[in-house]
Amino acid sequence: MWGERTHHHKHEHHKHEQHAHFPSGSSKEPKFIADSYSSVDEVIGALREAGLESSNLILGIDFTKSNEWSGRHSFGRKSLHAISGTPNPYEQAISIIGRTLSPFDDDNLIPCFGFGDASTHDHSVFSFYQENRPCRGFEEVLERYRQIVPHLNLSGPTSFAPLIYAAMSVVESSNWQYHVLVIIADGQVTTTNSSDRRLSPQEQATIQAIVDASFYPLSIVMVGVGDGPWDAMQHFDDCIPDRAFDNFQFVNFTDIMSTRKDMSKKEAAFALAALMEIPTQYKATQGLRPSEYLFFFLCILY
């Protein structure tokens, strides 16, 4: 009915001493982006003005069990994956991100993965289509999402690691083109309940995956939908050791969309919050020399 499960194991590699080389003193340096826009179109213009030239989108959707109750306050007690005449939070986020990044996507092909259902749990992902076929544009993403949701058994626990490694494989197969992985999820990575706040296996795996991904031309944007809590994700960056560049950002979709503004301004605010760091990260990945990608890839192989 949809794509087969795909296992993406942790890449074993040596310690890396190389770091991103940032362009300096150049007219191509990312420019400051203001924080008030009235429409998604204005945000698109701001991203282009700030230096974003090309970006390919990868989407990852959370199908863990908590989606059934995480909309108690923010989505009228309905499942966050409820399909009806009113777009659910996942559909809203997909649409806004898709509309914002599509002008920068040359082929408009969007690889889409699901995770956290009863077939994948925290150890693999599934593609929306067989043989990992991408969707053509965000409109097909939404159409395919609506088709598969009724047939999924929500489960867990939550780990972003398999999804991040799947995105890294997409980057490899694209000849190392720059991509943005947008993870839309209703909850943070599964934590332990221990008083000494030890990291759970899912947190450890996700942190390692984010570090590994920083050696790829790949930005990761985590979009939080539903009631949360989000305290751990908001401080997640602090737990991540040195990376080739700062490649992870969390955005609270619910907080932004619950403000008292008209819808076009809320959509613009969300698009900006999710993507305002992308021009800087795009430039950082351009600074990573191809030889550094090759070195990292060889470390994975050997």
Name each region found by the language model:
Residues 1-302:
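Acidic, low-complexity intrinsically disordered regions
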